[in-house]
Amino acid sequence: MDKATLRNKIYSKIDELPTLPSTVTRLLALFEDKRSNISLITEVIRKDPSLAAKILKVANSAYYGFSQKISDLERAVALLGFNMVKSLAVSIGVMKSLPSKNKTFISGKELWLHSVAVAILMREMGRRLYNDKESEHLFILGLLHDVGMVVFDQFFSENFQEVIDEAQFTDRKDLYRIEQRLIGIDHGEAGGMLLTRWNFPSVISLSVTSHHHSLSKEDLTKEISLLKLGDIISHFDIRDETKFDEPDEEIGLVLHYLEVGDRFVNEMLDFRESVKDEISSFFNSIN
């Protein structure tokens, strides 16, 4: 199958994918409505027992560490806050609509654990560099940045397995180039297409599309820069490299755009190590 035919097949397959659960789309609309309140949001969540149970599970997880058990859904929503409940609804909805079939050697658990780690890193960087109001859409972006891999795993497992086999012998940064050569597009573009179909904001879908591309400083945005940096920090192996002090040219551009240096990156590496248990706890709560 030539690349043009394969690309068209990808577009048609994405059109066949299910939409987000109706509860999630209803909640997203409520979160955008300034007239919404905790009672309205809780009422919608109650109609989806699975979502309600997972929100309670997160509220009682080690990730938050509340001193008393929380059994009332409305109280859980109040304690977690609208932004976190929105992130949870999206997280759970995406995993429900697009479960990894593990047709290739890619591990669905490993993929989503990495995505949760990047999400938590991006939110923390957003809080440190900007402000709390910016942080939740960064969490969602981090969570969904590799969703295109699940599309490949579901519908193009044979081609994607070839990618994975070849990528084992190259630098991780070359993965998207191998995808482009063997599949026709990379997982960022596939993910961006899916998120556009699901009506996610363009700042999220466009950032997902280009997060592995080599970009000039004129093409960088805050979201893409934080995503690139969060992805690298998540993968960085402190067992082999004790500190981050020699960024390549592209990451140098990202650090310059964000107006941070090696010290900030090493602080975020320390943060990543400090929240490992919380990352696992959060993943287990929503999975």
Cite the ranges covered by each PLM segment.
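Conserved alpha-helical "signature site"
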Residues: M1-D146, V150-E162, Q168-D171, L175-D248, ...
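Terminal helices and disordered tails flanking the catalytic cores of nucleotide-processing hydrolases
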Residues: M1-K9, G252-N287
